Amino acid sequence: MKKKHFILLLTIILFAIIPVCFNIFWSAADDPRYIFMTSGAYTGTPSGSLMYVGSLYGSFIAFLYSITVNIEWYSLLYYFFFILSIAIITKKILWANIKAEIKYLGLSLILFTHTYMALSPQSTFLAADLSIASMALLYRYKNRINLIYAALVFFIATQFRLFGALMPYFIALPIFFLNKGVSLSNVRKYIVPSCFFILLSAITFGSDYIRYNSTPEWHEFKKFDAARCYIADNPLSYKLSEHISNPQIRNL
């Protein structure tokens, strides 16, 4: 038992010092932009209206920045929830009733993948990781406390990226029925909570829709963001810069 706690503690410490000891680069352009928006670097006022992040979470970060901008709240919360998901998944593997070889193979895989995620963070990765952590809490849960924890972790995942949180459940939900099959007790144990998680997703989507369609300014920003995404996702977008520097280029 002491060995398991030592490994869990060592894992948490390892991933806690990575962002302190190494240069971290966000793997997507969205996250640095969200840091500027929530901190007020763009407009001078912290804003929680973010395109792909849940409005509740965005408002919470903006509130923290309104208290002080001397703390990098966006990154700090990111790594807090990142370490939380690692701790949950690692603990589930360590305490699982499986062969030691499979257990340490799983831990090695967790170490490898999460080291990359720690050095090159992205909110979509974190949403999926938190979703997997909620599945770990849900799998063979023994009491309602674990179910509540699983629901809370999943809701946090939807605030980072809604579809990033849903995807692991779409893929891995059949795993819950490997032991007992699709029995009535199994359906009650896993399908009912999954339906509740879908309700949480609907709440996230609904609150975001209301927030992001309630002001004309946000409507105009969505038009701008749609054009930005089109340019960023266009494989020929590099020619746009050539066209700017050389107006003679017409065939884009």
Language model feature labels by segment:
Residues 8-50, 62-65:
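Extracytoplasmic loop-helix module adjacent to an early transmembrane segment
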Residues 47-72, 76-81:
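Short hydrophobic/aromatic helix or loop-helix immediately within or flanking a transmembrane segment
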Residues 80-97:
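Transmembrane-helix motifs of polytopic, lipid-linked glycan transferases
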Residues 100-105, 139-155, 188:
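Short hydrophobic alpha-helices at membrane interfaces in multi-pass membrane enzymes
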Residues 106-132, 155, 159:
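Aromatic- and kink-enriched transmembrane "portal" helix at the membrane-lumen/periplasm boundary
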Residues 147-162, 173, 194-203:
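Membrane-interface alpha helices of multi-pass inner-membrane proteins
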Residues 167-199:
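Perimembrane helix-loop-helix junctions
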Residues 209-252:
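Membrane-proximal stem/loop segments at transmembrane-domain junctions that anchor or position
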